[in-house]
Amino acid sequence: MKNDHYVFNFYFFRSKITSNHLIRLNTNYLKKTILFISSDIPETIYEKFYLQSFKLFIIYYNINL
């Protein structure tokens, strides 16, 4: 799974986002990983966290396992 690319399937309301919401995508289709997260960035994407507000940031993040 090294260097695979993922994107969050997230919802526009206050609910927890976990690794269960990650969807594996074709690396040829998606060159970079787009993570939709709150202003508080977790240490790892597998760490459970909650949306602090509706103001979200788009972060390009390469996942290396």
UniProtKB/Swiss-Prot annotation:
The keyword Plastid applies. The keyword Plastid applies. Keywords: Chloroplast, Plastid. It is found in: Plastid, Chloroplast. GO terms for cellular component: chloroplast. This is Uncharacterized 8.1 kDa protein.
